[in-house]
Curated annotation (Swiss-Prot):
Its main location: cytoplasm. It is found in: Cytoplasm. Keywords: Cytoplasm, DNA-binding, NAD, Repressor, Transcription, Transcription regulation. Belongs to the transcriptional regulatory Rex family. NAD(+) binds at residues 90-95. NCBIfam families: PRK05472.1-3, PRK05472.2-2, PRK05472.2-3, PRK05472.2-4, PRK05472.2-5. GO terms for biological process: negative regulation of DNA-templated transcription; response to redox state. This is Redox-sensing transcriptional repressor Rex. Modulates transcription in response to changes in cellular NADH/NAD(+) redox state. SUPFAM superfamilies: NAD(P)-binding Rossmann-fold domains, Winged helix' DNA-binding domain. It comes from the Bacteria.
Amino acid sequence: MPEEKIPRPTIKRLAIYYRCLEKQLLQEKNSISSKEIGELLGIKASQVRKDLSYFGEFGKRGVGYDTKKLLEGIGEILGIKKEWDTCIVGAGNLGVAIANYPGLTKSGFFVKAVFDNDPKKIGSVLASGIIIDDIQSMPEVIKKRNITIGVITVPASEAQKVADALVDAGILGIVNFAPTKISVPKNVRVEEIDISVVFRSLAFHVNMLQKGEW
């Protein structure tokens, strides 16, 4: 099915299902139902089934899913078996934390470069062993290292300029942590992650719980 017909929330939930199934397989749970997946994740079983139905049949009604086969199937859909070379633009606290996060490598995302425009940071070596490159070298480095995904961790005022540079260098996917929307061509995918929005959403739910309305 064409990607544009699959709801973006479904794609995000697939990643959550994948992580859940990994844990279940480690616990030697060889079969699992949509109800069990839903209970583990706080998602309706009908939603789990609907999400999976976009990609064909994974299990049998009344029997459930083979955990390993479902994990492999979702992994193939998400491209997890592939290795994705990634770069980070902005060597501030957030950018450095992401670059040093070992979970990315385990998920198939390899940070091949970190860029910044601060002369004091350029040439520094991160805990992960990555050397911070001058942002001016970004086009050359991205092409040389076959990087396809870029992560933006710069101030909002610089985000669009960085996005334009990433696109010009051939980047096909961008994770934008800057608190502003960016514009890119239709052939480039963007995931906007505004941490403040997550906190506001959480605050709403906590507020409702405190009021006893939930």
